[in-house]
Design a protein with these regions (language model features):
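Feature for secretory/organellar precursors and membrane-associated catalytic proteins
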Residues: 1-72
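A structural signal for short, hydrophobic beta-strand segments that form beta-sheets
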Residues: 32, 39, 78, 104-108
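Active-site metal-binding motif and surrounding structural segment of the metallo-beta-lactamase
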Residues: 73-79
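Phosphate/adenylate-binding glycine loop and adjacent helical scaffold
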Residues: 84
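Active-site environment of divalent metal-dependent phosphoester hydrolases
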Residues: 89-90
C-alpha cells in the first residue's frame, strides 16, 4: 500500500488518520480519537470509548472488551489519544502514552491499495 499525507500544520481533528512516530520509536498510522483537554475512558466490559462522559460514535472500528483504560485519562494541552482501526491487533494509546503534536508527522488523505497477485 502507498499512503499520501500532508505535512501542513493544519488543525488536527477527531477521526483524522495520521502518520506518527510512536513512543516505541516506530512510525505508525493511527486515528485521532481524543483531543487536547478531553477526558478519555474505555469501558472494561463493553469496550465503549467515552469522551468527556459521552459515548463516541465510531464508524472506523470498535474497541474490544478487555482493551480499556483503568481510569479516565485527561489529555494535556498538546496530547492526542490515538487508536488503530484494527483495534484487536493495534498498539496505540492504550499501550503507550498519548502522542504530542510533534510526534504527528502528517495527516493521511489517501491510501492506494496494492493489488494482490496470485503466486
Amino acid at each position: 500500500d502507498l499512503v499520501l499525507c500532508s505535512r501542513s500544520s493544519g488543525t488536527l481533528q477527531r477521526n483524522d488518520t495520521v502518520l506518527l512516530e510512536a513512543g516505541n520509536g516506530q512510525t505508525q498510522i493511527k486515528r485521532i480519537i481524543g483531543l487536547p483537554g478531553e477526558q478519555v475512558y474505555i469501558d472494561r466490559r463493553t469496550g465503549t470509548v467515552m469522551i468527556d462522559g459521552r459515548e463516541l460514535e465510531e464508524d472506523f472500528g470498535t474497541t474490544l472488551p478487555g482493551t480499556y483504560l483503568d481510569y479516565p485519562l485527561t489529555l494535556g494541552t498538546d496530547e492526542y489519544f490515538v487508536l488503530g482501526d484494527n483495534r484487536e491487533d493495534s498498539e496505540d494509546s492504550r499501550n503507550y502514552d498519548p502522542v504530542s503534536s510533534s510526534q504527528i508527522k502528517g495527516i493521511i488523505y489517501m491510501t492506494l491499495r496494492s493489488r494482490k497477485t496470485d503466486s
